[in-house]
Amino acid sequence: MSNTKTASTGFAELLKDRREQVKMDHAALASLLGETPETVAAWENGEGGELTLTQLGRIAHVLGTSIGALTPPAGNDLDDGVIIQMPDERPILKGVRDNVDYYVYNCLVRTKRAPSLVPLVVDVLTDNPDDAKFNSGHAGNEFLFVLEGEIHMKWGDKENPKEALLPTGASMFVEEHVPHAFTAAKGTGSAKLIAVNF
């Protein structure tokens, strides 16, 4: 999904401030995140590579805050209130689960004015619901709309999930931190949906 550079001075300072505010040292935060203290220190120094939206959400959750509170204030990237993304500017990312191409994310236009809004067109490449790979539930609510094909949706308890078959035109709302997974319906090949995280 969307990547945010940890080199941002704003993120580094906000992370350090929040960690200190909740009285955690590097080791305590690292332990809760499954990272090393050196990694946390690197993030606070504006180093450490890139973090995904999911990783930022996990850090925010552990620190009892929001992704927005850990990111610098938005600048204005709009032109008289509008931003346009042309087709050749659209990032395309592969979602891989257990070394299998699972999704292709076509990242739609984003703006600094609404940094938590992440709109995607998702090509769902697997059609075996038995192989559905649950996420752990992410920060931010999610809206889904099925554009093509049928989606087999699972959510909640991974061992005893709730399930629904969503035909073209169906939509669904998923509350933040609810584990979920979706595949194309069994034997249908693939499907396509719009997903908006906010």
Curated annotation (Swiss-Prot):
Changing Y105F: Abolishes (S)-2-hydroxypropylphosphonic acid epoxidase activity. Residues 136-196 form the Cupin type-2 domain. It comes from the Bacteria. It catalyses: (S)-2-hydroxypropylphosphonate + H2O2 = (1R,2S)-epoxypropylphosphonate + 2 H2O. Its cofactor is Fe(2+). Phosphinothricin tripeptide (PTT) herbicide and fosfomycin antibiotic biosynthesis pathways share early steps starting with phosphoenolpyruvate before the pathways diverge after formation of 2-hydroxyethylphosphonate (HEP). HppE is involved in fosfomycin biosynthesis after divergence of the 2 pathways. Homotetramer. This is (S)-2-hydroxypropylphosphonic acid epoxidase. It comes from Streptomyces wedmorensis. The gene is hppE.
